[in-house]
Amino acid sequence: MLDVCVDNYGITVDNKGKKLYLDPNRQPDSDLIFISHAHTDHLYKCIKENGNKIITSKITHKIAMHRGYKYGETFEQHGFELLNSGHILGSNGLLIEDQMYYTGDISIRKRAFMDAAVVPKAKILIIESTFGHPEYVFPNFESTIHKANLIISEMYHRGIPVILLGYTLGKAQILTNVFRHWKPLIVHDSIDEMNKLYSEFGVSMDSYVTFSDAERSDMLSSRQPWLLIAPITSCKNGFLKYIKKKYGAISIGFSGWAVKSYYKYALGLDHCLPLSDHCDYNDLISVVKKCNPEKIYTFHGFAESFAENLNLLGFDADPLIRKRGKRNKTIVKLDTFFTKSDP
Protein backbone atom coordinates (compact mmCIF):
# COMPACT_ATOMS: atom_id res chain seq x y z
CA MET A 1 0.00 0.00 0.00
CA LEU A 2 1.16 3.49 -0.80
CA ASP A 3 0.46 6.72 1.09
CA VAL A 4 0.29 10.03 -0.77
CA CYS A 5 0.45 12.81 1.81
CA VAL A 6 1.01 16.52 2.17
CA ASP A 7 2.97 17.57 5.25
CA ASN A 8 5.16 20.49 6.34
CA TYR A 9 7.72 19.62 3.66
CA GLY A 10 5.36 19.11 0.72
CA ILE A 11 4.03 16.11 -1.20
CA THR A 12 5.38 12.74 -0.11
CA VAL A 13 4.89 9.23 -1.42
CA ASP A 14 5.39 6.64 1.30
CA ASN A 15 5.64 2.87 1.11
CA LYS A 16 6.42 0.79 4.20
CA GLY A 17 8.38 3.61 5.80
CA LYS A 18 10.37 4.48 2.67
CA LYS A 19 9.67 8.02 1.49
CA LEU A 20 9.93 9.95 -1.75
CA TYR A 21 9.41 13.72 -1.52
CA LEU A 22 8.26 15.61 -4.61
CA ASP A 23 9.67 19.16 -4.78
CA PRO A 24 9.90 19.65 -0.98
CA ASN A 25 10.00 23.24 0.30
CA ARG A 26 12.68 22.44 2.89
CA GLN A 27 15.10 19.60 3.54
CA PRO A 28 13.25 16.49 4.69
CA ASP A 29 14.60 13.38 6.36
CA SER A 30 13.75 10.96 3.58
CA ASP A 31 15.22 8.31 1.32
CA LEU A 32 14.60 10.00 -2.02
CA ILE A 33 13.90 13.56 -3.19
CA PHE A 34 12.71 14.57 -6.65
CA ILE A 35 13.43 18.11 -7.85
CA SER A 36 11.46 18.92 -11.00
CA HIS A 37 13.22 22.16 -12.00
CA ALA A 38 15.41 25.01 -10.79
CA HIS A 39 12.92 27.74 -9.88
CA THR A 40 13.57 28.69 -6.27
CA ASP A 41 10.06 27.77 -5.12
CA HIS A 42 10.91 24.17 -6.05
CA LEU A 43 14.35 24.11 -4.42
CA TYR A 44 15.30 23.73 -0.79
CA LYS A 45 18.39 24.70 1.18
CA CYS A 46 20.54 21.70 2.08
CA ILE A 47 21.23 22.41 5.74
CA LYS A 48 22.96 19.15 6.60
CA GLU A 49 24.34 16.04 4.94
CA ASN A 50 21.80 13.34 5.74
CA GLY A 51 22.20 10.95 2.84
CA ASN A 52 19.35 12.35 0.72
CA LYS A 53 19.37 10.83 -2.75
CA ILE A 54 18.39 13.45 -5.33
CA ILE A 55 16.54 12.60 -8.52
CA THR A 56 16.74 15.46 -11.03
CA SER A 57 18.07 16.35 -14.48
CA LYS A 58 21.69 17.37 -15.05
CA ILE A 59 20.53 20.78 -16.27
CA THR A 60 18.39 21.40 -13.18
CA HIS A 61 21.26 20.26 -10.97
CA LYS A 62 23.72 22.66 -12.61
CA ILE A 63 21.35 25.65 -12.50
CA ALA A 64 20.50 24.90 -8.85
CA MET A 65 24.19 24.72 -7.97
CA HIS A 66 24.76 28.04 -9.76
CA ARG A 67 21.98 29.58 -7.65
CA GLY A 68 23.70 28.46 -4.45
CA TYR A 69 21.90 25.19 -3.73
CA LYS A 70 24.31 22.39 -2.80
CA TYR A 71 22.91 18.92 -3.41
CA GLY A 72 25.92 16.77 -4.27
CA GLU A 73 25.58 14.24 -7.05
CA THR A 74 22.25 13.28 -8.58
CA PHE A 75 21.00 9.72 -8.32
CA GLU A 76 19.36 7.36 -10.79
CA GLN A 77 17.05 4.60 -9.60
CA HIS A 78 15.32 1.80 -11.44
CA GLY A 79 11.60 2.47 -11.82
CA PHE A 80 11.85 6.26 -12.11
CA GLU A 81 11.72 7.98 -15.50
CA LEU A 82 12.27 11.70 -16.06
CA LEU A 83 10.01 13.17 -18.76
CA ASN A 84 10.31 16.68 -20.20
CA SER A 85 7.62 18.88 -18.60
CA GLY A 86 8.07 21.82 -21.00
CA HIS A 87 8.22 24.40 -18.19
CA ILE A 88 11.81 25.68 -18.34
CA LEU A 89 15.09 24.23 -19.59
CA GLY A 90 15.83 21.02 -17.68
CA SER A 91 12.36 20.73 -16.14
CA ASN A 92 10.90 17.24 -15.80
CA GLY A 93 7.92 15.34 -14.56
CA LEU A 94 8.45 11.97 -12.86
CA LEU A 95 6.96 8.66 -13.98
CA ILE A 96 7.07 6.07 -11.21
CA GLU A 97 6.99 2.38 -12.13
CA ASP A 98 5.06 3.29 -15.31
CA GLN A 99 1.99 3.82 -13.12
CA MET A 100 2.18 7.12 -11.24
CA TYR A 101 2.98 10.42 -12.99
CA TYR A 102 3.89 13.66 -11.18
CA THR A 103 3.84 16.64 -13.56
CA GLY A 104 5.81 19.21 -11.60
CA ASP A 105 5.18 22.55 -13.33
CA ILE A 106 4.09 21.74 -16.87
CA SER A 107 3.43 23.28 -20.28
CA ILE A 108 2.23 21.42 -23.37
CA ARG A 109 2.82 24.38 -25.70
CA LYS A 110 5.94 24.74 -27.81
CA ARG A 111 7.47 28.16 -27.18
CA ALA A 112 10.55 29.27 -29.14
CA PHE A 113 13.23 26.65 -28.27
CA MET A 114 11.09 25.01 -25.57
CA ASP A 115 9.43 21.74 -26.59
CA ALA A 116 6.01 20.73 -25.30
CA ALA A 117 5.79 18.35 -22.34
CA VAL A 118 5.81 14.59 -22.79
CA VAL A 119 2.67 13.20 -21.13
CA PRO A 120 2.57 9.44 -20.45
CA LYS A 121 -0.32 7.11 -19.71
CA ALA A 122 -0.55 6.40 -15.98
CA LYS A 123 -2.99 4.97 -13.46
CA ILE A 124 -2.37 7.81 -11.01
CA LEU A 125 -1.79 11.46 -11.96
CA ILE A 126 -0.48 14.15 -9.60
CA ILE A 127 -0.99 17.38 -11.55
CA GLU A 128 -0.26 21.03 -10.84
CA SER A 129 -3.22 23.40 -11.04
CA THR A 130 -1.63 26.87 -11.00
CA PHE A 131 -4.10 28.02 -13.65
CA GLY A 132 -6.70 25.35 -12.98
CA HIS A 133 -9.67 27.70 -13.29
CA PRO A 134 -11.78 28.12 -16.46
CA GLU A 135 -11.11 31.88 -16.47
CA TYR A 136 -7.45 31.24 -17.29
CA VAL A 137 -7.28 30.47 -21.00
CA PHE A 138 -4.27 31.82 -22.89
CA PRO A 139 -3.99 32.97 -26.51
CA ASN A 140 -1.49 31.08 -28.64
CA PHE A 141 2.19 31.93 -28.34
CA GLU A 142 2.55 33.43 -31.82
CA SER A 143 -0.31 35.92 -31.40
CA THR A 144 1.08 37.14 -28.08
CA ILE A 145 4.53 37.71 -29.58
CA HIS A 146 2.93 39.47 -32.57
CA LYS A 147 1.07 41.88 -30.25
CA ALA A 148 4.28 42.64 -28.39
CA ASN A 149 6.14 43.31 -31.65
CA LEU A 150 3.42 45.77 -32.71
CA ILE A 151 3.79 47.69 -29.44
CA ILE A 152 7.59 47.73 -29.71
CA SER A 153 7.41 48.86 -33.35
CA GLU A 154 5.13 51.76 -32.45
CA MET A 155 7.38 52.81 -29.55
CA TYR A 156 10.53 52.63 -31.69
CA HIS A 157 8.80 54.76 -34.33
CA ARG A 158 8.17 57.35 -31.61
CA GLY A 159 11.71 57.07 -30.24
CA ILE A 160 10.58 55.52 -26.95
CA PRO A 161 12.62 52.72 -25.30
CA VAL A 162 10.85 49.55 -24.13
CA ILE A 163 11.31 47.29 -21.11
CA LEU A 164 10.17 43.65 -21.41
CA LEU A 165 9.54 41.96 -18.08
CA GLY A 166 9.59 38.22 -17.34
CA TYR A 167 10.85 35.75 -14.75
CA THR A 168 14.65 35.73 -14.56
CA LEU A 169 14.86 32.00 -15.25
CA GLY A 170 12.71 30.59 -18.05
CA LYS A 171 10.55 33.42 -19.37
CA ALA A 172 13.45 35.86 -19.80
CA GLN A 173 15.38 33.42 -22.00
CA ILE A 174 12.36 33.00 -24.27
CA LEU A 175 12.04 36.80 -24.48
CA THR A 176 15.75 37.11 -25.30
CA ASN A 177 15.31 34.56 -28.08
CA VAL A 178 12.12 35.78 -29.75
CA PHE A 179 12.88 39.53 -29.57
CA ARG A 180 16.55 39.28 -30.58
CA HIS A 181 15.85 41.09 -33.88
CA TRP A 182 15.32 44.38 -32.01
CA LYS A 183 18.52 46.39 -31.61
CA PRO A 184 20.10 47.49 -29.46
CA LEU A 185 19.08 44.61 -27.18
CA ILE A 186 19.98 45.06 -23.53
CA VAL A 187 19.64 42.35 -20.87
CA HIS A 188 19.59 42.76 -17.11
CA ASP A 189 22.73 41.28 -15.55
CA SER A 190 20.82 38.66 -13.52
CA ILE A 191 19.17 37.43 -16.73
CA ASP A 192 22.53 37.39 -18.51
CA GLU A 193 23.74 34.86 -15.91
CA MET A 194 20.89 32.50 -16.78
CA ASN A 195 21.32 33.13 -20.52
CA LYS A 196 24.94 31.97 -20.27
CA LEU A 197 23.83 28.73 -18.61
CA TYR A 198 21.27 28.15 -21.36
CA SER A 199 24.02 28.71 -23.95
CA GLU A 200 26.14 26.03 -22.26
CA PHE A 201 23.32 23.57 -22.89
CA GLY A 202 23.02 24.44 -26.57
CA VAL A 203 20.38 27.19 -26.58
CA SER A 204 21.67 29.98 -28.80
CA MET A 205 21.43 33.45 -27.31
CA ASP A 206 22.24 36.15 -29.87
CA SER A 207 24.50 39.07 -29.09
CA TYR A 208 23.23 41.65 -26.65
CA VAL A 209 24.60 44.14 -24.16
CA THR A 210 24.26 43.72 -20.41
CA PHE A 211 22.54 46.50 -18.52
CA SER A 212 25.69 47.39 -16.56
CA ASP A 213 27.72 47.70 -19.79
CA ALA A 214 24.96 49.75 -21.45
CA GLU A 215 24.88 52.11 -18.49
CA ARG A 216 28.65 52.51 -18.44
CA SER A 217 28.77 53.25 -22.17
CA ASP A 218 25.91 55.76 -21.88
CA MET A 219 23.91 53.73 -24.44
CA LEU A 220 20.71 54.28 -22.47
CA SER A 221 20.98 58.04 -22.84
CA SER A 222 21.29 57.99 -26.62
CA ARG A 223 18.44 59.28 -28.75
CA GLN A 224 18.06 55.83 -30.28
CA PRO A 225 15.34 53.69 -28.62
CA TRP A 226 16.44 50.43 -27.05
CA LEU A 227 14.91 47.20 -25.77
CA LEU A 228 15.68 46.04 -22.23
CA ILE A 229 14.76 42.61 -20.85
CA ALA A 230 14.48 42.72 -17.06
CA PRO A 231 13.06 40.61 -14.20
CA ILE A 232 9.33 41.09 -13.74
CA THR A 233 8.46 43.16 -10.70
CA SER A 234 6.28 46.07 -9.72
CA CYS A 235 7.07 49.35 -11.46
CA LYS A 236 7.06 50.80 -7.95
CA ASN A 237 10.31 48.88 -7.50
CA GLY A 238 13.34 51.16 -7.32
CA PHE A 239 15.09 49.81 -10.43
CA LEU A 240 12.12 50.01 -12.80
CA LYS A 241 10.89 53.27 -11.33
CA TYR A 242 14.34 54.75 -11.94
CA ILE A 243 14.56 53.48 -15.54
CA LYS A 244 11.08 54.63 -16.49
CA LYS A 245 11.51 58.07 -14.96
CA LYS A 246 15.02 58.75 -16.28
CA TYR A 247 14.60 57.41 -19.83
CA GLY A 248 10.85 57.62 -20.42
CA ALA A 249 10.64 53.90 -21.19
CA ILE A 250 7.36 51.98 -21.34
CA SER A 251 6.94 48.52 -19.80
CA ILE A 252 5.47 45.28 -21.15
CA GLY A 253 4.99 42.42 -18.70
CA PHE A 254 4.54 38.77 -19.68
CA SER A 255 2.62 36.46 -17.36
CA GLY A 256 -0.25 34.01 -17.32
CA TRP A 257 -1.83 36.20 -14.66
CA ALA A 258 -2.22 38.93 -17.30
CA VAL A 259 -5.48 37.24 -18.32
CA LYS A 260 -6.90 39.38 -15.51
CA SER A 261 -6.66 43.13 -16.13
CA TYR A 262 -5.98 43.89 -12.47
CA TYR A 263 -2.53 42.28 -12.76
CA LYS A 264 -1.29 45.08 -15.02
CA TYR A 265 -2.55 47.75 -12.64
CA ALA A 266 -1.29 45.95 -9.53
CA LEU A 267 2.24 46.01 -10.94
CA GLY A 268 1.90 49.45 -12.48
CA LEU A 269 2.77 48.21 -15.98
CA ASP A 270 1.95 50.01 -19.21
CA HIS A 271 1.09 46.76 -21.00
CA CYS A 272 0.78 43.16 -19.88
CA LEU A 273 0.35 40.14 -22.18
CA PRO A 274 -0.68 36.57 -21.28
CA LEU A 275 2.39 34.38 -21.74
CA SER A 276 3.02 31.53 -19.34
CA ASP A 277 5.37 28.60 -18.84
CA HIS A 278 2.45 26.73 -17.26
CA CYS A 279 -0.59 25.05 -18.78
CA ASP A 280 -3.77 27.09 -18.94
CA TYR A 281 -7.07 25.51 -17.89
CA ASN A 282 -7.77 23.86 -21.24
CA ASP A 283 -4.21 22.56 -21.45
CA LEU A 284 -4.53 20.98 -18.00
CA ILE A 285 -7.70 19.20 -19.13
CA SER A 286 -5.77 17.97 -22.19
CA VAL A 287 -3.01 16.59 -19.94
CA VAL A 288 -5.57 14.70 -17.87
CA LYS A 289 -7.25 13.24 -20.96
CA LYS A 290 -3.94 12.19 -22.50
CA CYS A 291 -2.72 10.59 -19.27
CA ASN A 292 -6.12 8.91 -18.83
CA PRO A 293 -5.62 8.07 -15.13
CA GLU A 294 -7.88 6.14 -12.80
CA LYS A 295 -7.11 8.60 -9.97
CA ILE A 296 -6.05 12.26 -10.01
CA TYR A 297 -4.53 14.46 -7.32
CA THR A 298 -4.34 18.22 -7.89
CA PHE A 299 -1.88 20.54 -6.18
CA HIS A 300 -1.03 24.25 -6.07
CA GLY A 301 -3.13 27.17 -7.25
CA PHE A 302 -6.75 26.23 -7.91
CA ALA A 303 -6.32 22.69 -6.58
CA GLU A 304 -9.76 22.39 -4.98
CA SER A 305 -11.86 23.92 -7.76
CA PHE A 306 -9.90 22.09 -10.45
CA ALA A 307 -10.51 18.77 -8.71
CA GLU A 308 -14.21 19.62 -8.48
CA ASN A 309 -14.37 20.40 -12.20
CA LEU A 310 -12.54 17.18 -13.05
CA ASN A 311 -15.08 15.23 -11.02
CA LEU A 312 -17.89 16.92 -12.97
CA LEU A 313 -16.18 15.72 -16.15
CA GLY A 314 -16.31 12.14 -14.89
CA PHE A 315 -12.83 11.77 -13.42
CA ASP A 316 -11.94 10.75 -9.86
CA ALA A 317 -9.99 13.70 -8.44
CA ASP A 318 -8.98 15.04 -5.03
CA PRO A 319 -6.90 18.09 -4.09
CA LEU A 320 -3.64 17.61 -2.22
CA ILE A 321 -3.94 20.38 0.33
CA ARG A 322 -2.47 20.30 3.79
CA LYS A 323 -5.04 21.22 6.42
CA ARG A 324 -3.64 23.32 9.23
CA GLY A 325 -2.27 21.06 11.92
CA LYS A 326 -3.08 17.92 9.92
CA ARG A 327 -1.61 15.65 7.28
CA ASN A 328 -3.73 15.32 4.20
CA LYS A 329 -3.33 11.57 3.76
CA THR A 330 -4.55 9.37 0.96
CA ILE A 331 -4.04 5.62 0.59
CA VAL A 332 -3.14 4.53 -2.93
CA LYS A 333 -3.02 0.93 -4.12
CA LEU A 334 0.24 0.66 -6.03
CA ASP A 335 2.07 -2.31 -4.57
CA THR A 336 4.94 -2.30 -7.06
CA PHE A 337 6.29 1.05 -5.85
CA PHE A 338 9.60 0.77 -3.92
CA THR A 339 9.48 -3.04 -4.03
CA LYS A 340 12.80 -3.22 -5.88
CA SER A 341 16.00 -2.66 -3.94
CA ASP A 342 18.29 0.25 -4.75
CA PRO A 343 20.97 -0.61 -7.34
Q: Predicted segment positions?
A:
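His/Asp/Glu-rich metal-coordinating catalytic cores
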Residues: 2-28, 32-163, 170, 177
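Short acidic low-complexity segments
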Residues: 11, 19-28, 73, 207-227, ...
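Short, charged, surface-exposed secondary-structure boundary motifs
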Residues: 31, 64-69, 82, 111-113, ...
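Short internal beta-strands
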Residues: 52-62, 126, 184-194, 253, ...
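Active-site-adjacent beta-strand anchor residues
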Residues: 54-57, 165-166, 274, 299-300
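Active-site-proximal loop/helix segment associated with metal-binding centers of metalloenzymes
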Residues: 88-97, 106, 110-111, 124-134, ...
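Binuclear metal-ion centers of metallo-dependent hydrolases, dominated by the metallo-beta-lactamase
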Residues: 118-119, 133-220, 295-343
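C-terminal regulatory/interaction regions
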Residues: 214-343
